[in-house]
Amino acid sequence: MVVIRMARGGAKKRPFYRIVVADKRSPRDGRFIEKLGFFNPLAKGGEERLKLDVAKAEAWLAKGAQPSDRVASLIKEAKKAA
């Protein structure tokens, strides 16, 4: 099964997430099929908090990819902002 989820990056206590399409069996931060964007929960000032290619996300959802709960809410947020 293919899922759209977040892969954690960044430093200790400074999370930064890539939003990726991956096989459900692969590790959280491991192999992925395609990168759709990023999410920075600690963005300050002029930093971008969320960047997501909504068209690619919609295409993967149409193909049957299942988004995680958090990614589903981020897709909704990105659509509203666009």
UniProtKB/Swiss-Prot annotation:
Primary gene name: rpsP
Family affiliation: Belongs to the bacterial ribosomal protein bS16 family.
GO molecular function, one term: structural constituent of ribosome
UniProt key word Glycosyltransferase: no
Pfam families linked to this entry: Ribosomal_S16
Gene3D superfamilies, alphabetized: 3.30.1320.10
Coiled-coil zones: none
Record-annotated membrane-spanning stretches: none
Gene Ontology CC terms: cytoplasm; small ribosomal subunit
Entry protein name: Small ribosomal subunit protein bS16
Single biological process term from Gene Ontology: translation
Keywords: Ribonucleoprotein, Ribosomal protein
